[in-house]
Curated annotation (Swiss-Prot):
WD repeats lie at residues 558-588, 599-629, 640-670, 682-712, 723-753, 764-794, 805-835, 995-1025, 1036-1066, 1077-1107, 1118-1148. Keywords: Repeat, WD repeat. Coiled coil: none annotated. It comes from Synechocystis sp. (strain ATCC 27184 / PCC 6803 / Kazusa). This is Uncharacterized WD repeat-containing protein slr0143. The keyword Ligase does not apply. Signal peptide: none annotated.
Length: 1191
């Protein structure tokens, strides 16, 4: 080794761990460096979220250094230094202190006196004032960037930081009102996801920020590291390439391996000859890193990854299962789901070209399949039995759990997210246990009836003979009944919970279980019992949830081998299924078997109806295409292919037939004469599908060689495009002919234009996609996969719903011409029929953007919907019409209807707008306030009164009460109420210069009295008169008071807190009832128009119905998670909820037993076709109560 090389190594040592200095010679610049600098220079809010030891801190140091050289003022806040035990006041003071120390403010302000003088302010107000009056005013006209490192540490704080992240969003929104804010930018760094950091999705800054992707080093980016290798430049580059092949460019590992290689080269322990470099580096990595990795893990790296993977016991099973699947398959499609995102944050896997793969071979070697199995078995209480069941190909029922072991396993699993095989095992165990449970319950019911007869008889006899002992005997009698009811309730509760889990993987059996439990519960309870008195509630909840989501309508049995294809005719919606057993079965849409068609030798791979639905064609393994009529007559056999025929398709006029084959050709036939019109060659592998365009002028073929070819009807190639690295299995034309949906073996569906441009890539399947089909209106599509999943997509590429649970590959997928019937054929010999008609209780509003604010009004059946960069929509829930308010500001933060629904108030920042909606929508007034933060608002006005009032709950701890009058101007026969006066607000507040004022979180105006109620951050409830006099202040909740609402009749006040309780108060402030729900915050409340019913919604989407006496009367689960809006309809008969994704869900407001009866009836009605269809024993259920005589 030359002295020059040695000196170079000594002057540029590698740094393993920690942040690199801005001018460190081994710093390798990546694309993230360039993007972060460009975005920050443009004044954007940026965030860099990635796993540990990926170079985030080094990136921050480098970016700060370069910006400072440009004259930008930079400051870095390290969240770790603030600790995790501080209260909000101390934490925010710590932020202000770090800003003071890090910025050139020394001598400009005395910080400690400044903080003391503002003790009465809330923490976020104090931070805002410091930024606005000290930082922006003191630091001239220079740009300021605030870097915040280790932001994930805030997750350990005992209080919410929604306000902090909302403030970042405020700073960017404030630019429209105050140009000084254009100089201020933020950059966040950490190991987290945006959804981890802020609960309030309407106030998140991350949807206006720029995510900076931080990837591993490429060879070009890593070249500065080669300077430290004591060899010539060519050898150094080659060695670096081998190192990156092992590390995947992971910065920490790359530095560590470079250091090991450099040391070995210095000592002469490494042969750098070109032909041996790969082998010697592999040996070095095996010896120094992989072997005995626990002792070699210095600085700690691998243990950090393992700890992050295993630390959350509720989620670790799911993460391990997902990682196990990636190890087994090599890669799976990336869908950016929560579990995939969390797994990526461990650092174990990386997203590459739409695929989730192991990050590098070193991780694969350390965290290998054996390590995963070992950790999974540590987690699972049933690991041994599960493995034995898997080894038996899922057949050994003796390995399934029973009794107490099953209950313990379900209890353990209830709080965890597990892998698919776990749920499959528990589901199979539950199915087996269910049969025994139902039989036992029937025996218990019969015994109960017998016991009642015997005890009643005994009471009569003994009362006659014992006299005074009758009371004791009566008590024993009722105690016996109570015990039996409790036992039945316990079992029914378990069955109801089991039904929901079972439904996830097998829809009809899940519904059957819920029906069995619901029917038994219906007979067990009395009409006058409230839900809180029920011995079990899960049957009712599970029935509601299942019936709002179920799609599976019927299961058609009879094939003796896997189903390869299904088709639905335009004539009577008849269903044809083709199978490897060499037959086609024909069914009615209700599931009645019509006939079997035989004639092929070997498997049948495809079936397709003619456009008029009167005939169909089949493609066979025997190299033939056959044409049949519906009566079973063979009309034609087409011969010419030299290998198996994989698909057949009729032209729109029904005269031409296209077939594809394993012989690498497509043939066009005049099927009536049997004549071959053209043979389309050029494919280099099997051709799996071909389809005519809607106008019949073009044929598209897709091939396993990754090519898509367009042909005219004369057989001439029009165009060819594709992706040579993938194989295509299916294709479908958009109804207007402007798009092609193509199913691929990489788990994606791609949407191409006929010109060869990819418009969207739909990722979500875990294995290759087999079929794809557009809905008739072209707005949506369905795809199926070899792993047994079906996904419902929007044409824009959004995944609407993923259906899982099929144990085998799905090769058949067909949609009826009305879009309401979906047929699915799978390798398990079954055809499943789904009803895709929209559920009456669940409507997707198909909104063009993310919802930001929602307001509902019962009187007018109207929902106001505000979105990002879209007009305000008024949606009528009765007739489902839409009205657009084009004069509304976009990106509204808040909306509020008046109680009569004739007025609508909107807010964005400091700007307010008021509309009158009586006849036609009219923007009446736009004004601005000096309020920087409003948490809640209420609006009161009536057609009979000229007075109106607006109350605003502010972050400064005040309520601002605005009042005005309407000037009734007559124009023709139409009276218009226009507010012409806006009085200065009355400011209502508790506290003084010594007592700190907490932010007001909620406010409500009494419907008739000049009175309002307000709730603050600490759970205090305060009542005021409109003249500003205080009525009463009460400690109402133990935490933030989230919601307040006076009843429409004005007789009571409803409050809801973050600690999960709601309370009913008199208008004088006396506590009447406490509604106990759960520990989760209550985000939404509603009161029916007649004030008889109350609804609350928790942050997890659980909606509860109460009466005004505080009795729990119903529980409903939102299928879309947390809600943005909740209200009753005008008649108070339905409860309506709006979710973030635009789903509108409704539930009936009826007494419990009647609702349960209706649900059982609805479930039986759903299964009518299924129960009437002859089934194999495994799919047979009696459900005698679903028969007409049992109702």
């Amino acid at each position: 080794m030359s002295p020059i090389a040695l000196n170079l190594l000594q002057s540029t040592p590698y740094q393993v761990g920690g942040s690199l200095a801005a001018n460190h010679p081994s710093y390798s610049q990546r694309e993230a460096d360039r993007e972060l600098l460009a975005q920050l220079r443009a004044g954007k809010f940026c965030y860099v979220f990635n796993c540990r030891q990926m170079g985030k801190s080094s990136l921050r140091v480098r970016a700060m250094h370069q910006l400072q050289q440009d004259g930008v003022v930079c400051v870095s806040i390290d969240i770790t230094s603030l600790g995790t035990e501080a209260d909000p006041q101390k934490w925010y003071n710590g932020i202000i202190t770090q800003l003071y120390l890090g910025l050139p403010l020394a001598g400009k302000v005395a910080l400690k006196p400044w903080l003391r003088e503002r003790e009465q302010l809330s923490p976020i107000q104090k931070l805002r004032e410091f930024v606005e009056t000290i930082i922006l005013q003191t630091i001239g006209d220079r740009q300021i960037v605030i870097f915040i490192d280790e932001i994930d540490k805030v997750l350990s704080l005992p209080f919410s930081l929604d306000d902090f992240f909302s403030y970042i969003r405020f700073c960017y929104n404030q630019r429209a009102d105050d140009h000084e804010y254009n100089r201020l930018s933020f950059a966040l760094f950490g190991v987290a996801t945006p959804s981890d950091l802020i609960d309030n999705k309407t106030q998140t800054p991350f949807n206006i920020g720029q995510a900076i992707a931080l990837t591993g080093f490429t060879l070009t980016e890593a070249l500065p590291l080669s300077a430290g290798l004591p060899v010539d430049e060519v050898s150094a580059r080659e060695i670096l390439g081998e190192i990156l092949a092992w590390t995947g460019g992971q910065p920490f590992l790359t530095q560590k391996v470079c250091e090991l290689v450099a040391e070995a080269l210095q000592k002469g322990d490494l042969d750098c000859q070109s032909q041996t470099i790969a082998t010697t580096i592999a040996q070095l990595i095996e010896e120094k890193i992989i072997r005995h990795w626990e002792s070699n893990d210095e600085p700690v790296h691998f243990r950090t990854i393992g700890d992050r993977l295993l630390k959350d016991q509720a989620r670790s099973g799911q993460l391990l299962g997902l990682y196990q699947e990636i190890l087994h398959k090599g890669a799976i499609p990336a869908d950016d789901s929560v579990e995939q995102t969390v797994l990526r944050l461990t650092g174990l896997v990386v997203k590459v070209k739409g695929q989730l793969r192991p990050y590098n071979p070193i991780y694969q070697a350390i965290f290998n399949a054996q390590w995963v199995s070992k950790e999974l078995n540590k987690l699972r209480p049933y690991g041994t039995n599960l493995q034995a069941w898997i080894n038996s190909n899922y057949q050994d029922s003796s390995r399934l759990l029973r009794g107490e072991a099953l209950r313990e396993a379900l209890a353990w699993a209830s709080s965890k997210n597990l892998s698919g095989v776990d749920y499959r095992y528990l589901n199979a165990s539950q199915n087996q246990e269910q049969e025994a449970s139902l039989a036992a319950n029937q025996i218990l019911t019969q015994a109960n009836v017998k016991a009642k007869r015997m005890i009643s008889f005994g009471i009569v006899v003994l009362m006659m003979s014992l006299g005074g002992s009758a009371i004791a005997l009566s008590q024993a009698y009722f105690a016996t009944l109570k015990q039996q009811r409790s036992q039945q309730g316990t079992e029914l509760q378990r069955l109801g919970t089991s039904a929901q889990r079972q439904f996830t993987f097998d829809q009809i059996p899940g519904l059957v279980t819920a029906l069995e439990a619901g029917n038994q519960l219906h007979h067990l309870v009395k009409a006058d019992e409230t839900l809180s008195q029920y011995p079990a509630t899960s049957p009712l909840v599970s029935l509601q949830q299942i019936l709002s989501q179920i799609a599976e309508k019927n299961v058609l049995t009879g094939h003796r081998d896997g189903v390869t294809s299904v088709a639905i005719s335009s004539h009577k919606n008849l269903i044809a299924s083709a199978s490897r057993d060499g037959t086609v079965h024909l069914w009615t849409p209700q599931g009645e078997f019509l006939r079997e068609f035989t004639g092929h030798t070997g498997s049948i791979y495809r079936v397709d109806f003619s456009p008029n639905g009167k005939i169909f064609a089949t493609a066979g393994q025997d190299q033939t295409v056959k044409i049949w009529d519906l009566d079973g007559n063979l009309l034609q056999t087409l011969k010419g292919h030299q290998d198996s025929v994989y698909s057949v398709s009729f032209s729109p006029d029904g005269e031409i037939l296209a077939s594809t084959s394993r012989d690498r050709t497509v043939r066009l036939w005049h099927w009536r004469s049997g004549k071959t019109l053209a043979v389309l060659g050029g494919h280099t592998k099997s051709v799996d599908d071909a389809q005519f365009s809607p106008d019949g002028q073009t044929l598209v073929s897709v091939c396993r060689d990754g090519q898509i070819r367009l042909w005219d009807l004369d057989g001439n190639l029009i165009r060819q495009f594709g992706l040579p690295e993938v194989a295509f299995f299916g294709v479908n034309w958009h109804p207007n002919g402007n798009l092609l949906a193509v199913a691929a073996d990489d788990g994606t569906v791609r949407l191409w234009t006929p010109q060869g441009e990819i418009k969207a890539t739909l990722s979500g399947h875990d294995e290759f996609v087999t079929r794809v089909v557009f809905t008739p209106d072209g707005k949506q599509l369905f795809s199926s996969s070899s792993n047994g999943s079906v996904i419902h997509w929007s044409t824009s590429g959004k995944m609407l719903k993923k259906y899982q649970g099929y144990p085998e590959a799905i090769f058949g997928l067909a949609l009826a011409s009305n879009g309401a019937l979906l047929a699915i054929g799978a390798e398990n010999n079954l055809v499943k029929v789904w009803d895709m008609s929209p559920k009456s209780d669940l409507v997707n509003l198909n909104l063009p953007a993310v919802l930001g604010a929602v307001a509902e009004n019962a009187k007018t059946n109207t929902i106001a919907l505000a979105m990002e960069n879209e007009p305000l929509i008024l949606f009528n829930t009765k007739n489902r019409s839409r009205q657009f308010l084009s004069d509304a500001s976009q990106n509204l933060d808040r909306l509020k209807f008046s109680a009569d629904g004739q007025w609508l108030l909107g807010q964005r920042g400091r700007q307010w707008q008021l509309w009158q909606l009586q006849t036609k929508s009219q923007l009446l007034k736009t004004w601005r306030t000096d309020i920087s933060r409003v948490y809640d608002v209420d609006l009161r006005t009536t057609p009979t009164s000229p007075q109106w009032a607006i109350a605003m709950a502010t972050g400064s701890g005040e309520v601002q009460l605005w009042q005005g009058t309407k000037n009734n101007q007559t124009s023709g026969n139409q009276s218009q109420g226009v507010p012409i006066e806006l009085n200065d607000p009355i400011v209502l507040a508790l506290g003084n210069s010594i007592q700190r004022k907490e932010p007001i979180r909620s406010v409500s105006l009494h419907p008739t009295l000049p009175q309002l109620a307000a709730g603050d951050e600490q759970g205090n409830l305060t009542l005021w008169n409109f003249d500003g006099t205080l009525i009463r202040s009460i400690v109402a909740h133990g935490d933030r008071l989230n919601q307040l609402q006076y009843s429409p009749n004005g007789k009571y006040l409803l409050s809801a807190g973050r600690e999960g309780t709601a309370k009913i108060w008199s208008v004088e402030g006396q506590l009447l009832h406490t509604l106990k729900s759960d520990p989760l915050p209550i985000d939404q409340i509603a009161i029916s128009p007649d004030s008889q019913w109350i609804a609350t919604a928790a942050s997890d989407g659980m909606v509860r119905l109460w009466d005004q006496q505080g009795n729990l009367r119903g529980e409903f689960t939102s299928t879309s998670g947390s809600l943005l809006g909740l209200d009753f309809n005008r008649q108070g008969q339905w409860l309506l909820a709006v979710a973030q994704n635009g789903d509108l869900q409704s539930w009936p407001v009826t007494p419990e037993k009647e609702r349960l009866r209706q649900l059982v009836e609805q479930g039986c009605d759903w299964l009518r076709d299924y129960l009437a269809t002859e089934k194999q024993p495994a799919q047979t259920y009696s459900l005698e109560f679903c028969q007409p005589t049992g109702n």
